[in-house]
From Swiss-Prot:
The gene is psd. Belongs to the phosphatidylserine decarboxylase family. PSD-A subfamily. Its cofactor is pyruvate. Transmembrane segments: none annotated. It comes from Mesorhizobium japonicum (strain LMG 29417 / CECT 9101 / MAFF 303099) (Mesorhizobium loti (strain MAFF 303099)). GO terms for molecular function: phosphatidylserine decarboxylase activity. Is synthesized initially as an inactive proenzyme. Formation of the active enzyme involves a self-maturation process in which the active site pyruvoyl group is generated from an internal serine residue via an autocatalytic post-translational modification. Two non-identical subunits are generated from the proenzyme in this reaction, and the pyruvate is formed at the N-terminus of the alpha chain, which is derived from the carboxyl end of the proenzyme. This is Phosphatidylserine decarboxylase proenzyme. Coiled coil: none annotated. Keywords: Cell membrane, Decarboxylase, Lipid biosynthesis, Lipid metabolism, Lyase, Membrane, Phospholipid biosynthesis, Phospholipid metabolism, Pyruvate, Zymogen. Heterodimer of a large membrane-associated beta subunit and a small pyruvoyl-containing alpha subunit. Pathway: Phospholipid metabolism; phosphatidylethanolamine biosynthesis; phosphatidylethanolamine from CDP-diacylglycerol: step 2/2. Binds 1 pyruvoyl group covalently per subunit.
Length: 232
């Protein structure tokens, strides 16, 4: 590895969505620093946190159509059957839902859980309840992607939370997307639900830490069974 590559790998990329926030924090820090050194250091800490929040690291995604990867960094908050949001047009039939909760320290860039064609993108206004609540999946503001994958229809739903009130999605309906490919971002704490056909076997447990684009959430063609339980 060259010296240039070593230096490059030492710095985590920052997503462009964070540039305005980082610039505002930096400018505010300089302004406050003119009046108080204490305020300057507090502003510097806030700016550093903002840089950390909008980090966009590269991820190593397993290349296998049977695998479903996590759409976000966070904690697995739910694994089990659930009816997908009505606006996705997937009917009133239960699918396997795996929820990933992101706190304010998580990387908030969202990635596709599978590869395929984006059949539909639907944004729905709503409330801003705590994203950890189960009813947040149907009552909160959200943005859903319906993906026609090689193993059936899969949906990824970005859900706003108490603090996160800005959902960003740059994917387009009708286009194709790869497993682990970036498609959006949610600012300042939120959740992403993945809805899968019941033929998919969950490979994670509630409470487990997930890494977006890398952690395998479920597998198609695996041995049938109930969702994993956490064993301490």
């Amino acid at each position: 590895m060259s010296l240039v590559d070593t230096v490059k790998n030492a710095f985590v990329p920052i997503h462009r969505e964070g540039y305005p926030f980082i610039a505002a924090c930096g400018a505010g820090t300089l302004f406050l620093g003119y009046f108080s050194s204490v305020l300057f250091w507090l502003g510097l800490i806030l700016t550093a946190w903002c840089v950390y929040f909008f980090r966009d690291p590269e991820r190593v995604t397993p290349v296998d159509d049977r695998l479903v990867v996590s759409p976000a960094d966070g904690i697995i908050s739910a694994v089990g059957p659930a009816v997908p949001p009505r606006e996705l047009g997937l009917g009133n039939v239960e699918m396997t839902r795996i929820s990933v909760f992101m706190n304010v320290f998580s990387c908030h860039v969202n990635r596709s859980p599978v590869r395929g064609r984006i059949a539909k993108i639907e944004h729905r206004p709503g409330k801003f309840l705590n994203a950890e609540l189960d009813k947040a999946s149907t009552e909160n503001e959200r943005n859903g992607l319906v993906i026609e994958s090689p193993n059936g229809t899969v949906a990824a739903v970005q859900i706003a939370g108490l603090v996160a009130r800005r959902i960003v999605c740059w994917a387009e309906a009708g286009g194709s997307i790869g497993t682990g490919e970036r498609f959006g971002l949610i600012r300042f704490g939120s959740r992403v639900d993945v809805f899968l056909p019941l033929t998919a076997t969950p490979r994670v447990a509630v409470g487990q830490t997930a890494v977006g684009g890398e952690t395998v959430l479920a597998e198609f063609g695996g041995v049938a069974g109930t969702p994993l339980v956490r064993i301490s």
